[in-house]
Amino acid sequence: MTKGTPSQGKHNKGSNHIVCRRCGRRAFHVRKKVCAACGFGKSSKIKRFAWQWKKVTGKGNRVK
C-alpha cells in the first residue's frame, strides 16, 4: 500500500449527508446529526434568515 497523494483519493467513498427526516433534502450530516438546510437536530425551529428573501421597497417592487 502506498502512502501520499495517490492514497488520498480513497477517502471519498462514503457520503456525509443523507436525506433529512424533516425537510426531505439531502442535507442531514451523518456524523454531526444536524441538517444543514433546516437545522433539524440542532433546533426545533426551521432554520431561516432574512437574506433568503428579496426586500420589498415601495409599490413598484412587489415580490411574490
Swiss-Prot record:
PROSITE patterns: RIBOSOMAL_L37E. Binds to the 23S rRNA. Keywords: Metal-binding, Ribonucleoprotein, Ribosomal protein, RNA-binding, rRNA-binding, Zinc, Zinc-finger. GO terms for molecular function: rRNA binding; structural constituent of ribosome; zinc ion binding. One of its GO terms (biological process) is translation. Binds 1 zinc ion per subunit. The keyword Zinc applies. NCBIfam families: PRK04179.1. It holds the Pfam family Ribosomal_L37e. The gene is rpl37e. GO terms for cellular component: ribonucleoprotein complex; ribosome. Zn(2+) binds at C20, C23, C35, C38. Its cofactor is Zn(2+). It comes from the Archaea. It comes from Methanococcus maripaludis (strain C6 / ATCC BAA-1332). Belongs to the eukaryotic ribosomal protein eL37 family. A zinc finger (C4-type) spans 20-38. This is Large ribosomal subunit protein eL37.
